[in-house]
Amino acid sequence: MASSDQRPCEGSRMRRIAVSGHQSLPAQTVELIDERIRALLSEYAPDVVGVSCLADGADQVFALAVRDLGGRIEVVVPAERYREGLSEDAHGQYDRLFAQAASVRRLPFGDSTSESHMAASKLIVDEADELYAVWDGKPARGYGGTADVVAYARDRGTPVRVIWPDGAERG
């Protein structure tokens, strides 16, 4: 079970959107994805809760958009040493977004592994109204990748919105 630093609002009418997506995205792709995410979120803003692990790449782009549009960020930390597994370049943004989170839930894993990442992804999907998948449609490069999260969400009947604009590329 996850431990919680704060509890989400019960009975809230806010739209809960989880995110899963690729990391290490080229700058041009980040711009395309950011534009698309902001356009989609504007339908709900500011009444939106973005649920994310704050991984580098798509997760942080999504969380920034939620914050900038006046929504709330809820963070799920997959493992005690999760931050250390992120790219060095992502630490600053991770720390800033983490500090602004409305709630933080920590899973009981020590090491940041594929299993802890998938457990976190399952948790965010289970509690979401919808999943935004920043995904090129290709198979996961390892267990717990975006394709696995999309398959899990679809199996549960959670609506999935794939975000991969024309011109987007993986790093």
Predicted feature locations:
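Acidic/glycine-enriched connector segments
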Residues: 8-170
